């Protein structure tokens, strides 16, 4: 067993439960076969393509032993390619996704400075253009056949009509029909627009957001972004912990990010943050001077449901639609009261203008010292 594999197996991140799908198992077997053949260099383009669409090789949220085995062979190859290249920028452009992955893995595994690939993060690479597949005509062959029949029918009808210029009476009738159709269409459009304007938009409810207690198992600094931490957080998913990028470097030392309970927003759309896909967000309270974690009550467990009072029985959305701006509409109502409890404050709600963030036991969630905080 190599030193890198041994080092990986000593990390907490290697102990996460892994349950591969059939597709992921096939991917792992494919790369194992490539490694056994000793011919990984011809597969570098394929590896770069895989890492373009995934953070790690087997489409997981965190590295697996497959990443370590492939990394061990790919690192010296890429080092040689970069060192011998007459056009380093071109090499970086060609293998940009492998380089991002190598940078993360070598920092995770604490590769020695002699073996480490020194990556130029200031190199200005051209924008990557990804070709989109052309959509096939809807309906395929059936539509093509129907169109052919329609063309034949039109041709036959055309031949049935006598050739030559229509008389004036016919032209007048056609003009009147066209005018009437245009007026009817305009009236229908105006009616539809008026109905849409009169229809009040449905107000999103805070129950749409999937708040959960999370446990940060491990956090490291993002290899490509000085302001970001990359945390592995257990939020109770059967698939295992999530990878979460947080811009908290300026506010918390790395030690404060280890093995602690937090509140996590779990249904925002995943976002790529400097090459690493972030699949959730840590909830914090802040003012102009400082940032503080929203602290779960004592004896909380990873995966515990968190909600605002009155919405405990409602299920959150699977994923918030960014186009509908649900988070942007609700978040400004999140704040803290004088007792430092996180609340949802909406003065338009006459019956319940204030709702506390709570759990199934009715306990409060607080920040350490900031009243009237922005919570996000």
UniProtKB/Swiss-Prot annotation:
Residues 52-61, 91-121 are annotated as: Interaction with glutamyl-tRNA synthetase GUS1. Residues 22-46 are annotated as: Interaction with methionyl-tRNA synthetase MES1. InterPro entries: Arc1-like_N (IPR053836), Glutathione-S-Trfase_C_sf (IPR036282), NA-bd_OB-fold (IPR012340), tRNA-bd_dom (IPR002547), Tyrosine-tRNA_ligase_regulator (IPR051270). The keyword Secreted does not apply. Residues 205-307 form the tRNA-binding domain. Residues 146-180 have a biased composition (Basic and acidic residues). SUPFAM superfamilies: GST C-terminal domain-like, Nucleic acid-binding proteins. Residues 186-199 have a biased composition (Low complexity). It is found in: Cytoplasm. Binds to tRNA and functions as a cofactor for the methionyl-tRNA synthetase (MetRS) and glutamyl-tRNA synthetase (GluRS). Forms a complex with MetRS and GluRS and increases their affinity for cognate tRNAs due to the presence of a tRNA binding domain in its middle and C-terminal part. Binds specifically G4 quadruplex nucleic acid structures (these are four-stranded right-handed helices, stabilized by guanine base quartets). Also required for cytoplasmic confinement of the synthetases and tRNA. Present with 57700 molecules/cell in log phase SD medium. Belongs to the tRNA-aminoacylation cofactor ARC1 family. This is tRNA-aminoacylation cofactor ARC1. It comes from Saccharomyces cerevisiae (strain ATCC 204508 / S288c).
């Amino acid at each position: 067993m190599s030193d890198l594999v041994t080092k990986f197996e000593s990390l907490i991140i290697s102990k996460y439960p892994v349950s591969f799908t059939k597709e992921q198992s096939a991917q792992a077997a494919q790369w194992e076969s490539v490694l056994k053949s000793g011919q990984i260099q011809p597969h570098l383009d394929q590896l770069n393509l895989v890492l373009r669409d995934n953070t790690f090789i087997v489409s997981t949220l965190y590295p697996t032993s497959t990443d370590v085995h492939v990394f061990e062979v790919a690192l010296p190859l890429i080092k040689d390619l970069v060192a011998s290249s007459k056009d380093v920028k071109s090499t970086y452009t060609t293998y940009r996704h492998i380089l991002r992955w190598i940078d993360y893995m070598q920092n995770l595994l604490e590769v020695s400075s002699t073996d480490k690939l020194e990556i130029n993060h200031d190199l200005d690479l051209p924008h990557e253009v990804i070709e989109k597949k052309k959509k096939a005509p809807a309906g395929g062959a059936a539509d093509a056949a129907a169109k052919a029949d329609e063309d034949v029918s039109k041709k036959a009808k055309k031949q049935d009509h006598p050739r030559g210029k229509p008389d004036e009476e016919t032209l007048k009738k056609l003009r009147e029909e066209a005018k009437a159709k245009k007026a009817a269409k305009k009236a229908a459009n105006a009616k539809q627009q008026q109905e849409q304007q009169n229809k009040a938009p449905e107000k999103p409810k805070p129950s749409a957001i999937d708040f959960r207690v999370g446990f940060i198992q491990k956090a490291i600094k993002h290899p490509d972004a000085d302001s970001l931490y990359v945390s592995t957080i257990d939020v109770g998913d059967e698939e295992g912990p999530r990878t979460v990028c947080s811009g908290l470097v300026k506010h918390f030392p790395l030690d404060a990010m280890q093995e602690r309970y937090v509140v996590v927003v779990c249904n925002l759309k995943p976002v790529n943050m400097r090459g690493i896909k972030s699949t959730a967000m840590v909830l914090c309270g802040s003012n102009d001077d400082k940032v503080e974690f929203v602290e779960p009550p004592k004896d909380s467990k990873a995966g515990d449901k968190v909600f605002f009072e009155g919405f405990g029985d409602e299920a959150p959305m699977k994923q918030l639609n960014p186009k509908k701006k649900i988070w942007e509409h609700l978040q400004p109502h999140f704040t803290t009261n004088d007792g430092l409890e996180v609340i949802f404050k909406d003065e338009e709600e006459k019956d319940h203008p204030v709702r506390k963030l709570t759990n199934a036991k009715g306990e409060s969630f607080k920040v350490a010292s900031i009243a009237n905080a922005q919570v996000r």
